[in-house]
Amino acid sequence: MKLLPELMRFVQFTSTKYNIDESHAVGHSMKVLFNAHQIYSNTVHLHPYLKSQEPVIYTAAIVHDMCDKKYMNQADGIKEINKILTNKLGYTEIMFINKIVSTMSYSTVKKSGFPMLGKYQLAYHIVREADLLSAYDFDRSLIYHMYNTKQGFENAYVNANELFENRVLRHHADNLFITEYSKKRGYELYYDALSQMNTWKYIINSYDKSTSIEL
C-alpha cells in the first residue's frame, strides 16, 4: 500500500482508538498536510535542499496529532507512529519526524522555545506553521470545546473566543511565523477569523433572543 493512504487509515484508526474528536482527527490532518504543501511549495525555491525532506514534512503534517498529550501518552503515540513508518522511511527520517511532532505544539514552543534540529529546522517550522494556520478556523475551535468542555454551545463559543483572543490572534505578535508565506497567509486568516467570530456571535444572539453574549 502507498504510504499516504496508509497514513490516513492510521489517523482514522488512532482517532477512533483514543476518542480523538473531529477537531484533531482526519479532517485536521488533511488541512495541515494541505497547509504544509502550500508553505513548502512557496519556500523550496529558496531552499532547494528541502526537496529531499518532503517525505518528512508531509508525514509529520499527517500524524502530528497522533501523539497529542490531550488524548494519549505522547511516548505511546510515537511508538505507534514508528510502527507504521518502519520499513517505509529511513531511520533518520523517522527520527526527525518524531522530533518534529513531539516539539511543535503551541504549548511546547511557549514553554521551551524552538528545538535545534539542524538541517531539518526549516522542515520543522513548515509543519509547525501549517498547524498554526489551521488554528485560525474558529469553527474547529468551537467543535473542540463542544466535545471537551461538555458545557453547551454558548459556553463553547465563550471558551473558543477566549482562546482566540489570548493565543490564535497573537501568532504574529508572538513571532510564531518564520516563513514569508505563513506570515502573509496568517494575516489573511486573521481577518477571516475575526469575521467568523463576529458572525457566530450574531447567530447566537439572534437565534434565541433570551440569550446574549457579552464580550
Feature names for model-found ranges:
Residues 17-50, 63, 112, 116-215:
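Divalent metal-dependent phosphate-bond-processing catalytic cores, especially two-metal-ion Mg2+/Mn2+ enzymes
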Residues 32-37, 73-87:
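An active-site-proximal "capping" alpha-helix that borders the catalytic cofactor pocket
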Residues 47-53, 92-94:
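Short helix-terminating capping/connector loops at secondary-structure junctions
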Residues 52-73, 77, 98-107, 131:
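His-Asp-centered metal-binding catalytic motifs of divalent-metal-dependent phosphohydrolases/nucleases
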Residues 81-117:
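Hydrophobic, well-structured mid-protein blocks that either form specific transmembrane helices
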